[in-house]
């Protein structure tokens, strides 16, 4: 093989989920760049692959990318893998592939496992258009800002989340996006694989009853529907439902305003006006 870079997808859980081609290429390349050499070595040993590994992660990728491109230009062939799944999707690799493209190095993808796609295709949510935004920020304020920024997208929203933040994130989804359909995938392709469906609040209540929350999560949220100016559910009821789910009153008003295509002031007037027939829009 002439010098080139292969971007190779590896299993996200079940070790049978790898292609024949991926195994063959990993046996033939001069080196394999990976996030954690120990994790990748266990994977390689399982398939009888003995090629040398090089660490490539977020803390060294800028300098390492230049080094690896230079080696490829000298005729070596390398492979890029992540700890699990497809590289570059919320994993290191962008700088290396970008540098390769800039240098005129040939880059080939070996497609395979991806938690994003595995979760999406079993979700039951629309897949004709989706927006993947990786991991949400760890801080609540920043997390809610991201959710609000994509609230009007007419696409299924997809995020990754860690087990220690999943219930907080579901609470933020309720506060910012309301009662949209939500699907959560956990431990995909592994022994305890699970798909949870409902509203964000329903799934959160299910999770908090467990002794422990483990595994990596993929969170998918139904797309924003075009406002038709009408609803069978009164605005007051929508707000009461959100408050009952633990959402602050002003956050509930903000969420309902977005869903109904109204300003926060208009919603506030509707629920603060003189008592009488309930108004809805």
Regions found by a protein language model. Name each.
Residues 1-58:
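Glycine-rich, flexible N-terminal cofactor/catalytic loop recognition
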Residues 2, 77, 156, 163-281:
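A contiguous loop/helix-start segment that scaffolds small-molecule binding in enzyme catalytic cores
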Residues 4-8, 74-82, 130, 155-159, ...:
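Generic beta-sheet signal
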Residues 25-32, 104-108, 156-157:
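Short active-site oxyanion
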Residues 34, 107-112, 159, 184:
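General beta-strand structural signal in soluble alpha/beta enzymes
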Residues 55-62, 136-139:
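Conserved helicase motor
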Residues 92-94, 249:
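Glycine-centered tight-turn and secondary-structure capping sites
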Residues 95-153:
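Class I SAM-dependent methyltransferase SAM-binding "motif I" and its flanking Rossmann-like core
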């Amino acid at each position: 093989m002439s010098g080139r870079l292969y971007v190779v997808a590896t299993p996200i859980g079940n070790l049978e989920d790898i292609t024949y081609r991926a195994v063959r290429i990993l046996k033939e390349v001069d080196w394999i760049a990976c996030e954690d050499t120990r994790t990748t070595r266990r994977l390689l040993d399982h398939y009888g692959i003995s090629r040398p590994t090089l660490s490539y992660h977020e803390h060294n990728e800028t300098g390492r990318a230049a080094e690896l491109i230079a080696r490829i230009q000298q005729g070596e062939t390398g492979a890029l893998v992540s700890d699990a799944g497809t590289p570059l999707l919320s994993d290191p690799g962008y700088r290396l592939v970008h540098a390769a493209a800039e240098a005129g190095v040939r880059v080939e993808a070996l497609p395979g496992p991806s938690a994003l796609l595995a979760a999406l295709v079993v979700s039951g949510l629309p897949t004709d258009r989706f927006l993947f935004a990786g991991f949400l920020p760890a801080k609540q304020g920043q997390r809610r800002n991201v959710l609000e920024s994509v609230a009007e997208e007419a696409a299924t929203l997809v995020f990754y989340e860690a087990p220690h933040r999943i219930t907080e994130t579901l609470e933020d989804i309720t506060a910012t996006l309301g009662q949209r359909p939500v699907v959560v995938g956990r431990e995909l392709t592994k022994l305890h694989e699970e798909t949870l469906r409902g509203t964000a609040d329903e799934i959160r209540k299910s999770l908090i009853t467990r002794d422990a929350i483990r595994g990596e999560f993929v969170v998918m949220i139904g797309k924003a529907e075009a406002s038709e100016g009408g609803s069978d559910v009164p605005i007051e009821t929508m707000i009461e439902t959100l408050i009952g789910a633990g959402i602050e009153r002003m956050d509930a008003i903000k969420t309902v305003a977005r869903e109904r295509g109204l300003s926060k002031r208009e919603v506030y007037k509707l629920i603060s006006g003189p008592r009488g027939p309930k108004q809805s829009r």
